[in-house]
Structure formats: structure tokens, C-alpha cells
């Protein structure tokens, strides 16, 4: 690998609440940010409570679940360009769409984000978060490490069903496996390497493309 990997973690996790706006540094976890919104009586981020990842990554890929996504609540994000320039960009300027933004194409680094919410009732917000957490436990392979839902949903299809129909549920490469509980997840059954995970994903995409002429 020729390049630099920047881990934005412990030193970039501050969360501040001002009225209905929450400003979050990129290293803060989505789960922690969702709890901050709940504690402030703000609704709109319940969908993100169970997504495994950071705010920076969520902005970069326009993360979403259960009918909500980052672009619905994002005011703007501060990014660092390759030239060392700091920019503040709106969701429209970031070209947010389904699991996409211009951040990867332009090699931006997300530093922080501001989200705008609506006032809500704390008990209803918590109830919705609990409801989604229960749904995740029932349907997703939370008993194994994973990076969450792995494949983008092709328009008009469900990725998990395509993978299952291709006979790939349980397909294994080393320690990496297509989950037997939910085919849209790649899990680590123990000792999986990045190379094994990447190879498995490519094989799944290749086999689904061959059988159904659909790219995931």
C-alpha cells in the first residue's frame, strides 16, 4: 500500500449541543452521537444509534439505516483537502446520495460535522432507539465482528436476497464469511485478514454479476 492512513479517533471525539444543532468531531462514534441527541431531547438521529462507525466515515459514505440517512440531518461538514485547505461544505456540495459522497473522489478528510434536528420527547426517542436495537439483534449477526452491512443495495433489488439466491450464504474465505444469519453482512469468524475479506467481497460481487447481471 503506497499512501498514508490517518486514524481520526480519541483526539477528535468532542460533541457539543447548541439548541437543535449538534456539532461533532469526526472521530466520535455514531452511537455516542445518537445518545447525545437523545439526552438533549432531539429527534432525527435514532437510525444511527446502531451503525458501527464514526461520524467522519458516516458523512463520507452517507451512512443510513431504517429509513434515515446522514444527508437528511447534515447541515455541513468541515473537511481538509490534499492541499491543506480547510473547507466547510453543505450536503449538496458534498454530493450526498445513496452511500456516496464526493469525499472519496476528491480525497478529502472529514474533520467535523454539524447536524440539525427537531425537538422531540426523550421517552419516544429512546423507545425508537430500543425498537431499532431489537430489530438489529433479531436480524443481524451481532455475535460476530463485522463492519456492518457490506454491500450497496442495487436499485430494484435487495443485496442480501441476491447473495442468498446465488447460493452464497455461509460462503467462507479463511476467517471471513458471508453471514448465515443475514447474507448482506461479511463477518469475521476468527482471524480473518483484510485480504480475505476483500477477496470474499470481490468473489460475491463476481458471482452475483454472473448469475443475475447485477453489480453490487
Predicted segments — roles?
Residues 4, 28, 51-58, 65-68, ...:
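Gly/Ser/Thr-rich helix-start
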Residues 4-42, 69-88:
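N-terminal glycine-rich flavin-associated loop
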Residues 37-75, 146:
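A gly/ser-rich beta-alpha-beta helix-loop segment of oxidoreductase catalytic cores
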Residues 80-216:
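Phosphate/pyrophosphate- and phosphate-bearing ligand-binding catalytic cores of soluble enzymes
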Amino acid at each position: 500500500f503506497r499512501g498514508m492512513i490517518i486514524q481520526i479517533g480519541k483526539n477528535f471525539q468532542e460533541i457539543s449541543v447548541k439548541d437543535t444543532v449538534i456539532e461533532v468531531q469526526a472521530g466520535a462514534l455514531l452511537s455516542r452521537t445518537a445518545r447525545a441527541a437523545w439526552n438533549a431531547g432531539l429527534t432525527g438521529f435514532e437510525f444511527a444509534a446502531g451503525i458501527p462507525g464514526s461520524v467522519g466515515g458516516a458523512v463520507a459514505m452517507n451512512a443510513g439505516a431504517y429509513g434515515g440517512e446522514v444527508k437528511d440531518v447534515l447541515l455541513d461538514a468541515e473537511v481538509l483537502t490534499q492541499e491543506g485547505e480547510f473547507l466547510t461544505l453543505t450536503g449538496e456540495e458534498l454530493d450526498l446520495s445513496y452511500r456516496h459522497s464526493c469525499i472519496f473522489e476528491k480525497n478529502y478528510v472529514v474533520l467535523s460535522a454539524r447536524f440539525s434536528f427537531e425537538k422531540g420527547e426523550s421517552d419516544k426517542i429512546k423507545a425508537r432507539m430500543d425498537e431499532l436495537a431489537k430489530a438489529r439483534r433479531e436480524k443481524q449477526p451481532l455475535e460476530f465482528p463485522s463492519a456492518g452491512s457490506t454491500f450497496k443495495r442495487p436499485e430494484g433489488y435487495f443485496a442480501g436476497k441476491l447473495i442468498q439466491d446465488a447460493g452464497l450464504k455461509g460462503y467462507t474465505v479463511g476467517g471471513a464469511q458471508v453471514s448465515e444469519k443475514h447474507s448482506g453482512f461479511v463477518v469475521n469468524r476468527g482471524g480473518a485478514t483484510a485480504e480475505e475479506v476483500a477477496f470474499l467481497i470481490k468473489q460475491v460481487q463476481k458471482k452475483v454479476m454472473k448469475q443475475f447481471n447485477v453489480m453490487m
